[in-house]
Amino acid sequence: MAAPVVAADSPVIENMPETAGGATENSAEAQKRPQFGTRFLTDPRQVFQHNAWDNVEWSAEQEEAALKKVQENSQPLPAEKQEEFDNRANEYWNDFYTIHENRFFKDRHWLFTEFPELAPQQKHLRGAEEKESLEHMLNGEDISLNPTHDEFPGASASYRILEVGCGVGNTVFPILKTNNDPGLFVYCCDFSSTAVDLVKSNPEYDPSRCHAFVHDMSDESGEYPMPDHSLDVIVLIFVLSALHPEKMQKSINRLGRLLKPGGVLLLRDYGRYDMAQLRFKKGRCLSENFYVRGDGTRVYFFTQDELHDLFSSAGLEKLQNLVDRRLQVNRGKQLTMYRVWVQCKYRKVLAPT
C-alpha cells in the first residue's frame, strides 16, 4: 500500500515514519524488513517499482530549494503565543490521544531490525567476569551495577528498558510480545496522562513486566521511578523533537544519569529538511527549525551534529549517528516524497578517560 498524501498541516504527515518506511506494513512484513540502507535507486526510471528507496542523495538544486522553503517560513510567532504552546503542551497531547486513542500509530516492529538491542535474542544476563570487569573500570566511582536503593518497580530485573514518550504502547507491547526473557522489565512514560491510561487499559499490559507512568522529561524536578545507573536501554522514538530546544540538553543529561555504565540510548527522530518541515505553512514557526502543528503539538527538525552535541555533552559516546534519507513513492498517484530522519545509538562511557 502506498504512503498516503494528506494535508500539510495534518499530524499524519509528521507521523508517517511510524512504520519506518512510510507505507503501512503488517507485523510479519515489518519484522522481515531489511535494515535501512539496503535498497538503492540506481535507475531513476525504476522509481515506481517499490514503495521506498534508501539513501537517496539530494542534488544541489534540491538542497537549495529546501533551504529557500524553510527560510520562507522562518518568521517566529509572537512570544506570547509561543509561551501558550509551551504551557499547554500536555493539554494538546491529551487532546490528541483523546481523539485518536490507539488507532493512529502502527506497532513499531521495525525497531527490532534497526535496534537489535531490543530484540529477544540479545543476551541480557551479565556473567560474573563481565560484571567484575565493569565494576573495576568505574575506577572507584560510587556506582553499583545493582543499585541498593529502596524497592522500585523492576528492582529484581536483570535487563531494564525505558521508553520515553511511549504514546499508547506501539513500542512497548511489541517488545513484551516478542521477548519472553524473565529478567526483562520495561518502563514507559509519556507527557500525556491520556496516553498512559490507554497503555494501562490495554489487555496486554502486565504490571509484573511493565511499569507505565506519566512524566514530563523536560521537568528537571520530576522524579523517575527507578534509581540512577539502573537502565540498560533508553528508547526515544520521535519524542525529543517535541521538546522546546532550550530544554533538550538538561533532559538528555538526566536520562544519561539513569543509564548503567555501558548502557545505550537509542533515538530515531526528524531530520533537517524532512518533507514534514517543508510542508509547514507560514505562521507555524516557533523558532529556527521548530514548529507548531495544527493540533498544537510541536516538532523540531535535527541535524546529526546537533544530536551528537546533545549526547556527547551528557557523557555518551557515539556508536551510530546516521541520516536516513528515504524516497517514498505513491505508485497509484505517481508521486515522490522525500523523508529525512536521524537515527542514533549512544553509549554511556564505562569510565573516565
From Swiss-Prot:
Its EC number is 2.1.1.-. GO terms for molecular function: tRNA (cytidine) methyltransferase activity; tRNA (cytidine-3-)-methyltransferase activity. Keywords: Cytoplasm, Methyltransferase, S-adenosyl-L-methionine, Transferase, tRNA processing. It is an enzyme of class 2 (transferase). It is found in: Cytoplasm. Pfam families: Methyltransf_12. The keyword Endoplasmic reticulum does not apply. Its main location: cytoplasm. GO terms for biological process: tRNA methylation. InterPro entries: Methyltransf_12 (IPR013217), METTL2/6/8-like (IPR026113), SAM-dependent_MTases_sf (IPR029063). Transmembrane segments: none annotated. It catalyses: cytidine(32) in tRNA(Thr) + S-adenosyl-L-methionine = N(3)-methylcytidine(32) in tRNA(Thr) + S-adenosyl-L-homocysteine + H(+); cytidine(32) in tRNA(Arg)(CCU) + S-adenosyl-L-methionine = N(3)-methylcytidine(32) in tRNA(Arg)(CCU) + S-adenosyl-L-homocysteine + H(+). GO terms for cellular component: cytoplasm. Residues 1-37 are annotated as: Disordered. The keyword Phosphoprotein does not apply. Disulfide bonds: none annotated. S-adenosyl-L-methionine binds at residues 93, 97, 165, 190, 216, 237. S-adenosyl-L-methionine-dependent methyltransferase that mediates N(3)-methylcytidine modification of residue 32 of the tRNA anticodon loop of tRNA(Thr)(UGU) and tRNA(Arg)(CCU). N(3)-methylcytidine methylation by mettl2a requires the N6-threonylcarbamoylation of tRNA (t6A37) by the EKC/KEOPS complex as prerequisite. Belongs to the methyltransferase superfamily. METL family. Monomer. This is tRNA N(3)-cytidine methyltransferase METTL2. It comes from Danio rerio.
